[in-house]
């Protein structure tokens, strides 16, 4: 799909890609065709008045009649929308989506017999020109933050015929969900998917809604319902869980829609395909359209596209809505912040300015909670905002009878857009002006809908979670924390509520200390604030009760006033269990079922006919029982889990509120320091940078807390299902099974045309047992739930900030980083590569060889944990200091260097506090696994060598180690191999090191023929890969003993027995790059040497004369090995003097397989 990016607001009208077109209400606009049949009109949507009454304005909306009124704004809109379309088109599935929209022209209207008229067109002023249009993208309507998709004609949108459509779209304003910005490309994709429902004529009825959640915030039982299109398009957890063959998908919509679409597909074949009066291009477009099945459209959802585009999105529809909090909007500059790959710095790291419109957001809560005292005086008003969904008091489950005779119609195939052929579509010629015969009545009159609501109010004397949440929010920069809720709400804004006990204790403890007016004092204060906040917000506690062992979050009670009687959350949770966390506890409705009786007409059937018919009934009953299961599952998801999910949302917001308070305290202290100290400007810049990094680290700790919240409430929800719902389900199911078995048995016993043996066989064959149903095993349910309820709240970035790789190309060596952090890697061309423990290792030999890795993730500071690990092989003695790896600037940071035949790790802060750890001799030419882990919360430095903890140092006095964004790997006159250099943004524990160490080692071990690890001092026979059945033996010639093979089956030749010896007598297993000596057991012990006369391998008596070989495995054949001496391979020669000799020399004519050797157990 080609996107026309060469358009601007001043592009001249050519009546092809730029035209003045008529709208449905006879207004005229300048329109731009940016792709076949896809147009952009950079104007506000004409169907809504830009000036509306206050009562017509939506909650959370923004209204500005002047938005998008100047030519500059209109051009910006045009360019932004084009860029988003280019971004979508830049991905294969996005290009397929746009191609599909381009081809999905509505079926022509049959005006008279063989007289077909187009309904998808735009017209010029005097109807002189017509332009094919499937969709037209406008700016927003009256509410400038609302995106919408409007069909031209409802009848065509629902009948299978299809209709063109209009999109209202706002590209400039976005909002955050938790820590990431919502990508406008995904918002546009949502509109584009929805447009396919209209173009294909498969729009569901407006009343087809899905039970979505029980509204926990109301006293009465009220429900939210999700429109079918929004449900299908959103995807995510709801779609996965509720789409496991859900019973409500057995709806006439899915049956009728498929039939309607097939009707028009058939009409195309009969009436259109060979109609000479219809333009060929129209027929080609329709042919492409009907290659797509309706089910292909139903399968398209945002979850799929978000993964294909690597865009973060909320995994529950409810997550994206205004609920308990207000969105803040940010402005996107498409030249500075965005390109065809998305946000230039990612959805988290991009920094967007807040919109000026945030002060103009319409505030219309759905519910106002008045906290009153015993005198009915209002102490506090808290707002709860709508979730944007249709509300109802009808309990869907109490009225719904599970259908017995309707089959499940919709299944997910996961073959997304496989039938869309972009290349074929691009070859379709455009539909010309003269090809269009317009049908004038192609559009309904657009009538805007305004949601006029009035807030409900409730009074409560017990503070609700929303009251506690509101008390934690403050706009003032003058912050004083208090753990006394009543004192806070009585303070008229001078206090803010906090449950961070350690943090408040620390602030109280230092309240009367001397002013913080030096960088060192500030660093110590900042570090203490960070540590105490981390301890508070990530606190968990293991408990055991009748519901099992679980990890709870003690502060939840204090944060949201849940089970908070005298701060006894832990005890009350122990006693009452997870069901006590929610308000509405008895919601399960026993499903209404209706199972048909077995027809009496079958009583006289023969055994064969009866078997077949009873089997069909058995299958139908089996499926019906599954429908009952999904009914229970849906009820739990919508009525119980939705309440726990509300608690997840509120608790997460509480964490973010506390984080905001702490950050304001830090910023306040930083301002004081800058205004009241004599610190140099250079140090102030450093303090600012360090504070920024600490604020980032605080956000990371908050994310850990949010993850804890997620796990805690999800586990609680699962526990409620297991203990409160599942027993009712199993009891009901067992009774259903018992009744079905009973009626089946009674019927069979009445049958007159079969004998007793046949009756017994049929009864056994058509009776159910509990073992027939996986869902009667609670563990299967747990597995399903755990699979679907890991909520994606924040970008799950890799902990790796550097992950070194190296490989050889034809003309040069390539070194790079696989961490995904956009690291700049600079290195000289003379850097060598050798094969290391698992992969290529970098060989540093020359003076001042330097590899530089640059990215801003390397900037350490005061509070961030990090780890460094790598494999190291040192080939040289180092008596004087020689640098190896480091990240230092102005003598601040960390580095690793050689000195006195050992390795030294040095860390030094900006105040000169320093720690040096000397590691014992590692110059024995062996590979060593080095791990260095810095834990700033525990003030702990751990160093491991080969899985052994060699250093455990206190680094309490080390403060700010802010250094540059560069890590250097250099050769300061070293001779070393480095493999797998990695830097992580977290600590590494001993178990992780153990796993990684032995995983690497396991891959580094040399294997024998049976894939077993080779061992030193163990006896083997040696074979060459070319002759894998003929062992190496000895040949005596000219007073020398050489190695060869017995290629004449001479029984006098006996295979030699070999042992591998290592220079380190304590080493047991053979690894790659080991230096080995071969011992040969031939009467007396002999050793392998290389003849200086002919380069043959010969036997010598003295071990001191033996040659030391380097042993390696073959990359492609794991049970083969190679042997080298001075980088020259040992191989089996071609036949010479009747023998194939074992030789070590440079012979380039020898096949590579001759270099491969095999050791077999004896």
UniProtKB/Swiss-Prot annotation:
Gene Ontology MF terms in the entry: metalloendopeptidase activity; zinc ion binding
SUPFAM superfamilies (alphabetical): Clostridium neurotoxins, 'coiled-coil' domain, Concanavalin A-like lectins/glucanases, Metalloproteases ('zincins'), catalytic domain
GO CC terms in record: extracellular region
Encoding gene, per UniProt annotation: ent-120
Family designation: Belongs to the botulism non-toxic nonhemagglutinin family.
Single GO BP term: proteolysis
Record-given protein name: Non-toxic nonhemagglutinin type E
Record's function text: Assembles with botulinum neurotoxin type E (BoNT/E) and protects it against pH-mediated inactivation or protease activity at pH 2.6 (the pH of the animal gastrointestinal tract) but not at pH 6.0. The non-toxic component is necessary to maintain toxicity.
InterPro entries documented for this protein: Bot/tetX_LC, Clostridium_toxin_transloc, ConA-like_dom_sf, Nontoxic_nonhemagglutn_C, Toxin_rcpt-bd_N
Lineage: superkingdom: Bacteria
Keywords: Virulence
Subunit comment: Forms a highly interlocked heterodimer with botulinum neurotoxin type E at pH 6.0 but not at pH 7.5.
